[in-house]
């Protein structure tokens, strides 16, 4: 069996990113190991996730896009993030949902179907995240 354990996330300032992800987004700090002035490992985990994010200092142009965070209640999660100071975009939904053709329409999917509704935000370094609604977790 294979399991995805960690995704590396490039950041310019580890302390700023650590504050953003723990205080605003609500990630849990798992590791902050800083044995020397030039070596530091910071690992965070989203609530309910088995995959963590490791903050790594990188070239100032390095970015990760479209990291997905799933939730059973997109409206509530978006509101909670906004209340903590995260600039989250408006809701959008796949239209039509059953094909790669087409695009997106404004608002939540009227039927609240799994994998149909989204909202986006980015961290202070420009890494982008997509919140996606789904009511169940496939095994």
Provide a role label for each language-model segment.
Residues 1-18, 64-67, 132-139:
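N-terminal beta-strand motif that seeds the catalytic metal site of vicinal oxygen chelate
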Residues 51-53, 65, 129:
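Short beta-strand segments
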Residues 55-82:
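Helix-adjacent hinge/juxtasegments
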């Amino acid at each position: 069996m294979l399991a995805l354990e960690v995704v590396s996330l490039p950041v310019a300032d580890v302390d700023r990113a650590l504050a953003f992800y723990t205080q605003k987004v609500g990630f849990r700090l798992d590791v902050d190991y800083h044995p020397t002035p030039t070596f530091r490992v910071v690992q965070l985990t989203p609530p309910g996730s088995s995959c963590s994010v490791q903050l790594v200092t990188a070239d100032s142009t390095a970015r990760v896009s479209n990291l997905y965070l799933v939730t059973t209640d997109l409206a509530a999660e978006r509101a909670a993030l906004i209340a903590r100071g995260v600039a989250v975009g408006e809701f959008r939904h796949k239209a039509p949902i059953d094909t790669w053709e087409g695009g997106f329409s404004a608002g939540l999917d009227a039927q609240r179907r799994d994998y149909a509704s989204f909202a986006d935000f980015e961290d202070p370094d420009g890494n982008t995240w997509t919140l996606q609604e789904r009511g169940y977790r496939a095994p």
